[in-house]
């Protein structure tokens, strides 16, 4: 079940589906009226559409994708926070409804605090010129890591991406929340950043902090702290800062077991949820932007169909 706000115009609905690549088998079910703003045209509204997306897969019908824990009047009340669920909500509001020590692993790609917005010319496949929400909000990061410490079980791990420029702030925020910084893993990508093309060398890596609450032993053999995974570009890219599924799978593999709950407060295009499904883990997440919320739903539809047929 998915809930999002739009103005009710067919052209706005089509635009949202184009942005997300929502397949034709995901059908809108009903509408309800409250106040809101259309995420496509930006118009202030008196009515809001409550759009349910159903793919015909029994497991996905139980994987709830909705906003702020609400349901239509015809639906029964939902649990406060359910596993195998992505919520259209800001992470802090949502996490405060989660119980203490309720997740086994956290993998997150929060805003890097660098006011990122790509300068690349828009093409038919992407619309990445919109700035990332909360990308200049250090208070959010501090609150987030504090909430992460609260909901994470003892002796478990938290992987958090950050940029080379801001990693000191992220480390300090984590330590202030009582995490132990175990590694600053270097993720080597296949492409360079743009920047000053005449006076600055292209940056080809991002930082992935490995944090522990207590002491979290890893699974399997010991790895080095330089990980090489190709970045995502072209039509396969659904989010301007999208991470490879294989990279997230490595994090999940090293610090969780089958059946564990993996949390991500900044779901983006849903890569953490997709990786969790592939690794036979449960997931909980939040995403604040409606257009990526649609993308998450569609990716989970495809993931269950192609990689987890036992869940159908």
Where are these regions (language model features)?
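BZIP DNA-binding basic region
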Residues: 1-23, 47-52
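Short, flexible, mixed-charge glycine/proline-rich loop motifs
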Residues: 1, 26-34, 43-48, 66
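Short, conserved SAM-binding/catalytic segment
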Residues: 77-81, 297-311
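Short metal-binding segments enriched for Cys and/or His
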Residues: 12-26, 57-72
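Cationic, low-complexity basic patches in intrinsically disordered or flexible, solvent-exposed regions
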Residues: 19, 31-32, 76
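Short Cys/His-rich local motifs and their 1-3 flanking residues in nucleic-acid-associated proteins
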Residues: 9-14, 28, 40-43, 52, ...
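Core catalytic lobe of class I
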Residues: 65, 71-74, 78-294
